[in-house]
Amino acid sequence: MAAERSLWVVGLCPGSRLGRVVRVLLLLLWFAARGGALYFHIGETEKKCFIEEIPDETMVIGNYRTQLYDKQREEYQPATPGLGMFVEVKDPEDKVILARQYGSEGRFTFTSHTPGEHQICLHSNSTKFSLFAGGMLRVHLDIQVGEHANDYAEIAAKDKLSELQLRVRQLVEQVEQIQKEQNYQRWREERFRQTSESTNQRVLWWSILQTLILVAIGVWQMRHLKSFFEAKKLV
């Protein structure tokens, strides 16, 4: 999850039927892999951040639980209830969209409004508990993006859906999420194109500037040499 998850489809003709089918299949495989669980270690005063690429208008749910290292037992034990976790989420424009204090185990939810890289940061409030300061925490984190964030068992019970109706709803939401992912990939391609054009333009202007500088230096050297020869009465 800390690493960027991206999909680039190359070597296919955009207008061909085979190309469209392969694109959809690859998107389905990539979409099925979205979300995942991991654990990491942090000091109780340390801050750990992750980058998650998220399309716009997409729900994200994160579940976490913390364990505190017991030096006597030399193993991780469930953290005390007083030890909380502060969660902060920033959008690609560095605006804070979630900043909240949770307990030692909890769940946070947010919806993206801008496509791009979202920063998810966690750190404990252990500075309030000098007894635990300097200890080591193990944080188990599970982040689900888009359709994977939905609890379909709860939805089926709440809306009284049959198995077929629930399956249809899942497929509809998967298609909607795939469309969001496709739009996001197109947005990334457009951004990359703009960056490439801007870079090429800067390289061109820099080359022109270098040429003008070389011409100016050459003219100055010629005039300087001419003045030198005239002063020496060599010409």
Curated annotation (Swiss-Prot):
One of its GO terms (biological process) is intracellular protein transport. Keywords: Acetylation, Coiled coil, Endoplasmic reticulum, Glycoprotein, Golgi apparatus, Membrane, Protein transport, Signal, Transmembrane, Transmembrane helix, Transport. Residues 47-145 form the GOLD domain. Glycans are attached at residue 125. Disulfide bonds: none annotated. SMART domains: EMP24_GP25L. Residues 1-37 form the signal peptide. Residues 121-160 are annotated as: Required for interaction with STX17. Residues 154-184 form a coiled coil. It is a single-pass type I membrane protein. A motif (COPII vesicle coat-binding) lies at residues 228-229. N-linked glycosylated containing high mannose. Residues 38-201 are lumenal. Appears to be involved in vesicular protein trafficking, mainly in the early secretory pathway. In COPI vesicle-mediated retrograde transport involved in the coatomer recruitment to membranes of the early secretory pathway. Increases coatomer-dependent activity of ARFGAP2. Thought to play a crucial role in the specific retention of p24 complexes in cis-Golgi membranes; specifically contributes to the coupled localization of TMED2 and TMED10 in the cis-Golgi network. Monomer and homodimer in endoplasmic reticulum. Predominantly monomeric and to lesser extent homodimeric in endoplasmic reticulum-Golgi intermediate compartment and cis-Golgi network. Probably oligomerizes with other members of the EMP24/GP25L family such as TMED2, TMED7 and TMED10. Interacts with TMED5. Interacts (via C-terminus) with COPG1; the interaction involves dimeric TMED9. Interacts with PTPN2 and SPAST. Interacts with STX17; the interaction is direct. Belongs to the EMP24/GP25L family. This is Transmembrane emp24 domain-containing protein 9. The gene is TMED9.
